[in-house]
């Protein structure tokens, strides 16, 4: 073979190899999802936070070496399935405060204590306590939900009640009776576990305890003073038909009742303003915010809601994951983005800032500023509420299950109360000859009280805990 021919063959092979290399690179890039993400650290984040797409975009801009895949529709069921299967877990998961201990005790989320030195003073006591167990830190607070009293001022005034002066549970009961005279329920509760837990917390209850090593669990729903105090108070409200026990919060029926004033107030977390505006826009200007009434009027409070970002133990990219959650939860940019999107902050600086405290409007989905609370500087009330959250309440290390079981146990008391009210109404209509039926209406059956439900709930929780390998005691 001549030198000319060898040169031509060599050039041909070189060209062919170059083409193959390009094709291989294209195939590899396609396998990664896009050319934009090739060569970058890949993180998967599961979060339902509305502002998260904007946060991801901002983080990627500041950290071009990281590409994030955001999944917005995955919750605990999907996470538990992925953990059980051993694959498909995200690197970072948004966890509500009540759920975090369950994943910390089981070793599914990373201990971040060494990364968070000096962070405690940055956050409110309630939110910081919610990401810790046994002196260790398992996430960064993303938002918080100190309880507050949201009420339709116009409806309360129609009943002759100044809701801003309600300080104690007795005041609240008296107001409920006056509202009932004009055909209005002071609130609704169809048996919500999160609400029940928050009210027990508010009353100083400590029905659940977990040992420092996470192995021993105490459950005392029947003997705990705070639990029993709220159960007795709420049973009185239910027995006297002062609350709506048939309408589930966030349902269409609930939105209608809140909108027409037949449900006059809500005990909820400080995240409520943007949701009230979204769900009941027609009552803008009628509502106000006050601090929570407590058993004796003391300035104590509880959390209802709030969440953190945690890094999964299974993640092989803990450093990049930490950079992301620190950006979202600790940087000024991340916090401001979430607060502008309607989240209630967990950090002290925002809660104390003049701009935040002086706000009189709520931002709707189109960016319009709406004076939903009639010009009130509502964040002053909510910021103060955050400062009074007690830090002694503990969630169960299987709280996700506990809340799912609440409706089938304690919830039966609300169902019975609803059936009893229906029976009474039908019976009275029958006596008045308005039914066209001489037979008695269907009986609601044996009475079920909140105390009965708590007894069954405690039994179920005890059995579940033992089956999960915990040592469970009835304190």
Predicted regions and their residues:
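Conserved C-terminal helix/tail region of periplasmic/extracytoplasmic solute-binding proteins
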Residues: 380-475
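C-terminal lobe and pocket-closing loops
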Residues: 272-283, 297-303, 311-409, 472-474
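Extracytoplasmic "Venus flytrap"/periplasmic binding protein-like
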Residues: 58-123, 157-160, 255-257, 261-265
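A structural signal for short loop-to-beta-strand junctions that line the ligand-binding cleft
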Residues: 81-84, 90-91, 120-155, 185, ...
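Glycine-centered hinge/linker elements that transmit conformational signals in sensory
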Residues: 176, 216-248, 288, 292
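Short, solvent-exposed loop/beta-turn-alpha elements that line the ligand-binding surface or hinge
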Residues: 113-125, 165, 187, 206-229, ...
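Hinge/lid segment of periplasmic solute-binding proteins
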Residues: 97-147, 199, 288-290, 381
């Amino acid at each position: 073979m001549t030198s000319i021919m060898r040169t031509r063959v060599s050039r041909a092979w070189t060209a062919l190899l170059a083409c193959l290399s390009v094709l291989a690179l294209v195939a590899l890039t396609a396998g990664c999802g896009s050319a934009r993400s090739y060569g970058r650290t890949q993180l998967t984040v599961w979060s339902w936070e509305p502002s998260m797409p904007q946060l991801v975009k901002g983080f990627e801009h500041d950290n071009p070496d990281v590409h994030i895949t955001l999944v917005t529709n995955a919750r605990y069921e999907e996470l538990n399935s992925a953990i059980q299967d051993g694959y498909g877990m995200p690197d970072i998961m948004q966890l509500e405060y009540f759920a975090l201990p369950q994943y910390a005790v089981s070793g599914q989320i990373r201990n971040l204590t060494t990364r968070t030195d000096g962070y405690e003073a940055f956050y409110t006591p309630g939110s910081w306590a919610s990401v810790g167990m046994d002196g260790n830190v398992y996430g960064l607070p993303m938002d918080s939900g100190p309880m507050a009293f949201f009420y339709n001022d116009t409806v309360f005034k129609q009943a002759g009640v100044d809701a801003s002066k309600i300080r104690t549970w007795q005041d609240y009961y008296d107001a409920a009776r006056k509202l009932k005279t004009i055909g209005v329920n002071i609130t609704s509760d169809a048996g919500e576990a999160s609400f029940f837990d928050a009210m027990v917390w508010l009353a100083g209850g400590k029905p659940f305890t977990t040992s420092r090593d996470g192995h021993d669990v105490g459950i005392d729903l029947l003997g705990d003073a705070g639990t029993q105090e709220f159960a007795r108070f709420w049973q009185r409200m239910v027995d006297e038909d002062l609350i709506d026990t048939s309408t589930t919060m966030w349902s269409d029926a609930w939105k209608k009742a809140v909108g027409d004033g037949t449900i006059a107030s809500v005990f909820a977390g400080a995240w409520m303003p943007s949701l009230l505006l979204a769900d009941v826009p027609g009552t803008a200007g009628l509502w106000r915010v006050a601090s929570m009434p407590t058993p004796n009027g003391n300035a104590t409070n509880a959390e209802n809601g709030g969440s953190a970002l945690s890094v999964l133990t299974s993640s092989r990219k803990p450093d990049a994951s930490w950079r992301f959650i620190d950006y979202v939860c600790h940087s000024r940019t991340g916090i401001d983005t979430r607060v502008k999107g309607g989240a209630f902050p967990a950090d002290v600086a925002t809660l104390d800032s003049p701009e935040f405290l002086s706000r009189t409007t709520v931002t709707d989905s189109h960016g319009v500023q709406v004076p939903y609370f009639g010009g009130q500087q509502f964040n002053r009330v909510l910021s103060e509420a955050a400062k009074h959250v007690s830090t002694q309440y503990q969630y169960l290390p299987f709280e996700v299950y506990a809340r799912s079981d609440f409706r089938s146990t304690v919830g039966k008391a609300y169902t019975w109360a609803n059936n009893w009210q229906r029976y009474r109404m039908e019976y009275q209509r029958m006596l008045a000859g308005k039914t066209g039926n001489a037979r008695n209406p269907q009986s609601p059956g044996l009475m079920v009280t909140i105390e009965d439900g708590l007894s069954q709930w405690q039994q179920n929780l005890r059995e579940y805990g033992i089956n999960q390998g915990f040592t469970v005691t009835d304190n």
